């Protein structure tokens, strides 16, 4: 798996929980205070586990959870986080 380019992350402001957990991004160069982490819900798993694991991981680096929600059919989970430092 390849790293997520900083320009793409800054443009989209959204990253998958999988990318966070795989270490495919460097948030030290992320220019904004807020970011959205996503995870898919599917058959046999809720999606909350990888989403919350990613949020917990980012909490170690100065980010905090703002809110968790779903939009539309509910198959995609979204966690809004913000940089505290």
What are these regions (language model features)?
Residues 1-85:
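Terminus-proximal functional modules
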